[in-house]
Design a protein with these regions (language model features):
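Metallocofactor- and cofactor-centric catalytic cores in central/energy metabolism, strongly enriched
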Residues: 1-256
């Protein structure tokens, strides 16, 4: 594939991203246009018939927060309908569409036989535990860790190298594409409910979080075991973590 193909793919990706963002940011009384393309036709017809097709996802979330605030909405049927609109928008955009875009960016998942659980953590390595939902935000980190210079630096301080330890949902994303990351990704250690136990092994040297599924219970453990914490998004900001807001333009600086 030549430069023209690359530019065309990049432009297509940009158009898709802009379309998704435009849909999500619409007001609640404007229906999201991509919904018809990604939802099952019969379900879409039913949602349309019932009048529960959601407007812009962010506005729907805002309305839900306001409705559940003190002394506001008290109609259970209205709130149930609000929940249905939230479920439709987040299920189709937050799950289906997000996964489709991840497949475009990083390739589709592949079925493989791989070890999981605490046994994948080797204490002889410098281990970076990742938590969150957005695998693409770790792409530059992963690329840097694969370099011989970085791995040699780890060896200079007595480690065998540096590895990424998968935890929470982003760990499952890595596991689904494990064939692409065998050099630095050692496997999926556990979900968000076992992330505290993963840290208690004493084999983790750094926690990098980028979004949700980063539970508050890891804070005292990291403090007690002197495990450094970095957050790439203030949504998952922990009290004792350093915040490094991620932007595509500054990804190399952040990784360094």
């Amino acid at each position: 594939c030549g430069a023209d193909c690359h530019n065309s793919c990049a432009k297509t990706a940009e158009m898709i991203a802009d379309s998704v963002l435009a849909d999500i940011r619409k007001p609640y009384d404007e229906k999201m246009t991509l919904m018809k393309n990604i939802a099952l036709p019969k379900r879409y017809e039913l949602w349309e018939k019932l009048g529960i097709l959601p407007g812009g996802a962010k506005d729907e979330i805002f309305n839900a927060v306001v409705k559940t605030s003190t002394n506001l909405n008290s109609d259970p049927m209205d709130m149930l309908l609000q929940c249905l609109r939230l479920g439709i928008s987040t299920g189709n955009y937050g799950l289906i569409l997000t996964n489709l875009m991840n497949d475009i960016i990083m390739g589709p998942p592949q079925i493989s036989m791989d070890p999981v659980g605490f046994r994948i953590i080797d204490p002889e390595y410098i281990n970076i535990m990742i938590t969150g939902h957005q695998q693409s935000m770790f792409a530059d980190l992963e690329e840097k860790l694969e370099s011989e210079i970085v791995q040699k630096s780890a060896e200079l301080v007595g480690a065998k190298g540096i590895r990424i330890v998968g935890c929470t949902c982003v760990g499952q994303d890595y596991q689904a594409r494990s064939g692409c990351y065998k050099d630095v990704y050692c496997g999926h250690a556990g979900n968000n409910y076992t992330s505290e136990a993963v840290l208690m092994t004493g084999c983790v040297d750094l926690v990098v979080s980028e979004f949700n599924c980063t539970i508050p219970g890891i804070e005292p453990i990291c403090e007690q075991l002197d495990i450094k914490m970095l957050c790439l998004d203030d949504v998952a900001k922990k009290a004792n973590a350093q915040l490094l807001p991620y932007t595509a333009e500054e990804k190399e600086k952040i990784t360094s």
